[in-house]
């Protein structure tokens, strides 16, 4: 996805950019872009181009993650509140949740647009925990991006990686609490009391 939009700005894709940028926004994304394209690159133009491409690519709702419905049903049955804390724009979050008829399941929706620093800064997750009325140590973070896992670990959260586009590497294995192949496995671990003691 990045190659086409970068080309419109006269830039070539640099290996590793997608993994480094995934899950970031705002100043965190700008820092990634400067690392790859130099301190004087037009970060706002690059980000605008990438956001425009993402908005076009994701007009149709992506498929739900396997096990999502079962996990939400389990959490609701256990009276465990949920928050969406995503680096995506709020318009994208709402579009996906509305298309899936899932908006009402969540106590709060938190977008990366609300913060100057995004993942790997844990601020977005700390804000989510505040909305839930929980401490990081009793709050489960589910993440598929490296930056998200970094943010969860830095904030002291129970961080579970559910890999999607990028597999867990040695750094992720040092940082996360657990790795699950899908959300069904997350549910199983919760049922077995392996993630949150309250469950």
Each language-model region and where it sits:
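N-terminal helical cap/lid subdomain that shapes the substrate entry/recognition surface
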Residues: 1-69, 73-78
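Residue-identity detector for glycine
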Residues: 10, 16, 23-26, 38, ...
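Residues at secondary-structure transition points
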Residues: 16-24, 41, 45, 59-66, ...
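Asp-based, Mg2+/Mn2+-dependent phosphohydrolase catalytic module
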Residues: 73-76, 89-199
């Amino acid at each position: 996805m990045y190659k086409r939009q970068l080309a419109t700005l006269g830039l070539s894709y640099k290996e590793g950019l997608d993994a480094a940028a995934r899950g970031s926004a705002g100043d965190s994304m700008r820092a990634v872009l400067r690392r790859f394209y130099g301190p004087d690159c037009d970060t706002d133009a690059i980000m605008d181009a990438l956001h425009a491409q993402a908005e076009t690519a994701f007009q149709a709702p992506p498929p739900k993650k396997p096990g999502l419905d079962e996990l939400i049903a389990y959490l609701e049955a256990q009276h465990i509140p949920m928050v969406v804390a995503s680096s995506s724009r709020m318009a994208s979050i709402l579009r996906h949740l509305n298309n899936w008829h899932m908006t009402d399941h969540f106590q709060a929706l938190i977008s990366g647009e609300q913060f100057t620093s995004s993942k790997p800064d844990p601020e977005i997750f700390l804000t989510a925990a505040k909305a839930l009325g929980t401490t990081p140590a009793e709050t489960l973070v589910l993440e598929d991006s490296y930056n998200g896992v970094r943010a969860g670990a830095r904030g002291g959260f129970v961080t579970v990686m559910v890999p999607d586009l990028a597999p867990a590497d040695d750094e992720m294995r040092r940082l996360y609490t657990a790795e699950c192949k899908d959300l069904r496995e997350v549910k199983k671990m919760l049922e077995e009391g392996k993630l949150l003691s309250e469950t």
